[in-house]
Amino acid sequence: MSEPVRKLTFAEADARDDADALLGHEWLVTNGLGGFASSTVACVPTRRYHGLLVSALPTPLGRTVMLNHISEWVRLPNGARFQIGGQERAGGVLEMPGAHYLAEFRLEEGLPVWRYEVDGAVVEKRVLMLHGQNTVHVNYHLAEGDGPVRLKLRPALQFRPLEEAVHDSINEPYTITAVEDRLELCTGHTYPPLRLKIYGLRATFALDGGKLQNVYYRTEDRRGYPHVGELWSPGYFSVDVTEETSATLVGSTEEWELIRALSPEDAQAAEHERRERLLAAADPKARRGVGGELVLAADQFVITPSGRQQDAARAHAAGEEVRSVIAGYHWFTDWGRDTMISLEGLTCTTGRFREAGWILRTFGQYIRDGLIPNMFPDGSNEGLYHTADATLWFFHALDRYLKATDDRVTLEVLLPKMHDIVKCHLEGTRFGIHVDPKDGLLVQGAEGYQLTWMDAKCNGWVVTPRRGKAVEINALWYNALKLLKGWTREARGEASARDLDAHAERCRRSFNERFWYEEGGYLYDVVESWEKHGENDSACRPNQLFAISLEHAVLERPRWDSVLEVAREKLLTPVGLRSLSPDHPDFKPTYHGDLQTRDAAYHQGTVWAWLIGPFVDAWLKVHPEDRAGARRFLEGFVPHLDEACVGSISEVFDAVEPFTPRGCIAQAWSVAEVLRCWVLTSEQAGR
């Protein structure tokens, strides 16, 4: 994997001058804490979330944009100067001189490298973050040509919570402490200082502070948010690079002692070794090629959450660590549902079994009234519990983990909690979640809450409430009962599992009686829908696939083929499944615009990449010998690795061609499910 596995070439003049292409491609580097560095390939920030250092800070701060970008100039020995990178100003002023010199952008072991060519000189830039630290290294090297080449590096910043809109003015002054090759920047706020240090020949810093006004963030504009901001720069660093010596600018919110603990060379070697270990631990079918890329992409989502001291103390007392899963970059935090759906692909397929166990046990500590948290808000220690399915996915995730590890200790720890979950669902718990005693089916619904994975809500408007008896909720409920029955019988004997068996059988019988939509040849999405005044909702959605794809399929076998064929015909695309059939009157073909417009389309046609997972599982249940056919459903994701976030998989796509990627540029369950299915459909290692 040391060779570049993903490369974008900009040798042609038209490619370099295509602003949309350069600004539409993004990159992401993470630090294992939820912090990250990310921007466009052109190094022009277009989102409020873009930054060279977004630190994951302890509660109550959460993730914070600390360093926005660096403006870079190169001076050759002959005196010629050129700028790489750029910025965009309000009023349509796009300054992107570096595009004319950008010959190539590539990923090496998942880390970004830029290659700039000018007047016979080739300068390469690399970005990495130290794992487990809020520290970024930006490295420059003269790959070809005569040296020394002099670099001028001007950092631009505005300390701001990740989710906060960009500011058109900076009210708080920054104070500067400069000592030789290092700089410390502070505000009167509770933010930690931003510490900058330069490594290299003849390194200097010039105090030349000033504001950068009217900075335009085009993606924020398109998404309906404030989009003109102001940044501040303390001055600029100057440093020489040659073919023998590189230069590195370090930005960090850590203490100086930790920042200086590793030289840039040692940091790069350590990260290279860490990534090699990740690949070596993964399933042999996922160590090279597309599989290897996805293993490295998967690593970006597995984190040690910052600030949860109680979690850490509890885990450390047991000789363990705390782990969670970031649902997507840039804006999602750790979500229970996304974590449980992603767990197999992110951890079991990649050989990270210990971390999988830590994740399950961490969420097990947060069970309240038979529910695991739906999500943890940024900068908070407390979870929110408005979900009807995350807890049922917990059973699925535990099952996949046990099949991979046979970890009976974790099962013993969690088994009482799983019984308590079922008890709470049978008796009724929060948000109207309860089993209907008349038919054994699970009901969910509470006014003003979005409880299934189709959870868009804007200004109090729940777009797809799906209150009643939802198809995937009951498929998951049946699966949970059957799994718990098996675990209980193994641990406590047959007699202890009889009640669970009875509940499962009643659910199965009622499901097959109530959910079959004869006219369409598929399953109702919701039975006794509150939105349809007790009638059944016949919207054709991908949720029905879980009645086939889960370990214990609740749908009777003779109906599998029909459901699968309808899903293939109406919902399947090259990059996942539509969330609603195009023949439905509420179908929305594209996902764009302001928040309300986007939310109206979020689950009303928009394609979701992660849904390829249950489709492939269902396909292989119906066609167990046709792995090649199942692999074809994944091939559309390969060219997508060159789009949006290079080397990763987007959250959603438009529902019609050309299936433009939208939403989060890197989504945990998208990567996890494609990786899991890539391995599942591989005939040999490394395909």
List the predicted regions and their residue ranges:
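Acidic, mature catalytic/reactive cores of soluble proteins
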Residues: 1-687
